[in-house]
Amino acid sequence: MNLNRRVMGSTGTSSDDPPRGLSFSAVPGDQLHTPGAKLVPWIRAAIVASLLVMLFGAFVRASLSGDGCGTSWPFCNGGSLLPDTSVLKSVIEFTHRATSGLLLLFLAGLYVASRRVFPARHDVRAGLLLAVVACIVSALIGMILVRFGWVVLDRSVGRAITMPIHLVNNLVLLAGLVWAQHRAAGGAVSKWKGQGPLGQAFTMSVISVFLLCMTGALSAMGKTAFSVEKAMTNSLTERIQMHIGEGAHWILRGGALHPLLATSFGIMLVLCVNLMMTRRPEAGVKKWGQYTIGIFLVQMAFGLVNLIASAPWFMQLGHLLLALLNWMALIMTGVYALRVTASDSAVVEPVEADVAPAPRPVYAGIISDYIALTKPRVISLLLFTTLLAMFIAQQGMPPLGLILAVMVGGYMAAGAANTFNMVVERDLDVAMERTC
C-alpha cells in the first residue's frame, strides 16, 4: 500500500469518514462496498456468539457445574457422547463444550472465507486467525481445568494461575474479531509502533485492563471456591473480614485487590483515553473514547453493587459483560487514535544546520522526565514525616521490610499522584483556554 497518498479503505473508502451509530464499522452499513462487505455481518455475529459463549462459561463456574462431566474431555463422564440429561450440571457443562466447539468451527469458517477475499497478510485475515488461535487456546485451557480437577471448589495454585490467563486469552479473541470487522468494513489502517504518546497511552490502557481483568478472574474464582463459607456470612462486614482478615486465604486476599486496583487502574485508563481524545480529536476517537470511559464508570458502580449484594451469579455475568464491552470499546478507541494518515507518511525534507544537536540518550531522557513529573524533593519531605511517625508508633526502629515497602510504595504512589495532577491541570488549562 502506498502510504504517500491518502489512506483509503479496501475499496477506496476514505479513512476520514466519521463513524455513525453503534456499529463497529467505519462506514454506515448501507454504504459498505468493500470486497469483504459480505463478511461483515458474519464477523459481527461471531462477536455476539463469542460474548455468549464467554458469559455461559462464567455461568458454568458460578453455578458450580464445572465438574458436570467429571474429568473426561472432550466427552462426558468416561467417554459418553451425550451427557446424563437427568443431571443438570452435566447438561450445563456439556452445553458449554458444545457451543465452544461450534464457535471454533464458525471462526475457522470465517478465516477460510477471508482467505478467498483478502490477500495474504491482510488485517482481516490476521484478525480472524488470531481469533481462531485464541479459541483453540481457550479450549485447551478448559481441558486442563477439567483434567486436573481445577473446577468448582478447588483452591489450587494451578487454577489461580490458569483462570486469569483464560480471561486474558478471551480478550485477545475479541480484539482479533473487532479489528477484523473494522477492516472488513473498510476501516482505516492503524499502526501501533512509532505513534509516540498515542501509542504509549494505548499500551498503558491495554496493560491496565489486562491486570484488572486478571485480578477480577482471581476474585471470581474465590467467590466460587469459597462459596460455602461465603454463604455462611451474614453481613458485608463479615464478607470483607473473610477476604482481608487475619487468617484469610491467599486467594481471597488476592481477589480483594481487584476493587482496589479498579480505582487506580481506572484513573490510568481514563487519563490515557482522554490523552488519545485530546491528541487526536476526531469523531471516531471521541465516540469510542467516551464509550470506554462511560462503560467503565458504569462497571465500577455495578461492581460496588455486586460486592454489597454478595455477588449473585447473574450480577457476576453482568459485571463480566460490562468488562468485555469496555474492552471492545477500548480497542476501537485505539483503532481510530492510531490510524495511519497521509501526514504520517509525508516525506520531510532534511533541513541543513551548522551544528546538529546531540541526541539525548533515551534512558537519560526518561529519567529526567520522571524526576520532573514526580517532584522528588516534595515527596522526600512527605516520606520523612511518614517514616518519623513509624518510629514513634513503634517506639524504636520498625522492621526493615516495612520501611522499604513504605518508602518505595509511598514514593511511587506520591509520584503517580503528582503526575496525574499535572496532567489534569494541563487539560483544565486547555479547556479553560488559559494556555495555548
Regions found by a protein language model. Name each.
Residues A45-V48, K287-W288, G294, F384-T386, ...:
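Membrane-embedded alpha-helical segments that form the functional core of polytopic membrane enzymes
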Residues F56, V60, H96, A414-C436:
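Acidic (Asp/Glu-rich) catalytic motifs at the cytosolic membrane interface
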Residues K38-S65, S208-S219:
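N-terminal signal-anchor transmembrane alpha helix
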Residues L102-G109, V168-A184, S264-L271, L324-R339:
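Hydrophobic cores of alpha-helical transmembrane segments in multi-pass inner/ER membrane proteins
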Residues A62-F94, A225-I251:
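Extracytosolic (periplasmic/ER-lumenal) interhelical loops and adjacent juxtamembrane/interface segments
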Residues M214-F265, V270, N274-M277:
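Membrane-interfacial catalytic/cofactor-binding modules of polytopic membrane enzymes
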Residues D84-F106, A248-T263:
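Individual transmembrane alpha-helix segments
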Residues V60-T71, L140-P164, S219-K230, A301-L324:
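Interfacial helix-loop-helix junctions of multi-pass membrane proteins
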